Amino acid sequence: MTEIVAEISGNHGGSLRNALRLIETAAEAGADAVKFQCFEPERLATRRVWRPEVWALSGGVPLVDLYRKTHTPKEWFPILIDYAEFYDLKWFSSAFDPKDVAFLETLDCPRYKISAFEMLDWDIIKAIKETGKPIVLSVRPRCGLTILEATQYEGIHWNTETELGLSAHGKRAPFPGAPMVEYHLRLNDVETPDASFSLRMAELQEMVRIIRG
């Protein structure tokens, strides 16, 4: 059965209460899990500054400013994790830097996602692989070559603990047999940089209905 993941991303708009509301919304919509994003704005902006495809998606906003608006403070993570577990939601996180992985390991992160933009970042791949935890690779249209290149990294032996999951922007049903599909979730009354490609609760409920058949 396809696992349905609600991506919290930066749709909390810098509010812990909104982040908790997103977890409540994910549970009410029928998601199986929530995913967080763990990064420090300055470090992520530095690591991505040379990526033209990232700049193309930033709308001309300096990357560090964009990431400051969308990051989830590390001090929130224990609270968010407890809240997700209260609602019987599984949780995991993306990590974008080896230091993020080290932090998430202190919280016993059960699995990690490598985002599409980091799939050829050998430092983060190595750091995550060394945890021994399951890994989720992000699948987007036309990224097959990138996945192939990522799996050729020396010392990385991808196995049954590596999953391919569709990271969907907007309303997109998963490809048949997908083990996982991830949708960005938003609140009706909060506008954020991620809101335009995120689903409201009713839309996520509809996708759950379609996927579950």
Residue ranges, per PLM feature:
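Catalytic cores and adjacent flexible loops of soluble metabolic enzymes
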Residues: 1-213
